[in-house]
């Protein structure tokens, strides 16, 4: 939750917060599978959005697309929030889905040269011979 210019990132024995006035435009979240990278990114995107900071997020796997809808308030989540002293309630965030094909979201306008050969080959599902042409 963003309160008084801070964004709560996590809490163990101490609170870990990001101070919004000194937040960097770029960052790196790295770690092994299951260490909370996606959860951290989702929390940061939600917090920045609530603070009025625009967020651009490339979600190739679709792990974070759920930001658009409020979550379900489950018992264990409410218990954890209360234990941490958080006044948590599920809420959605403003989301625009960009769609390279312009079918299921906001059309992404790009030229063939801007897309590049690798992505173009994937979009057209080319085989190795076709890619070489």
Language-model segments: what does each one mean?
Residues 1-93:
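Glycine-rich phosphate-binding loop of nucleotide-binding enzymes
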Residues 81-133:
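Helical/strand "switch-coupling" subdomains that flank nucleotide/phosphate-binding cores, especially
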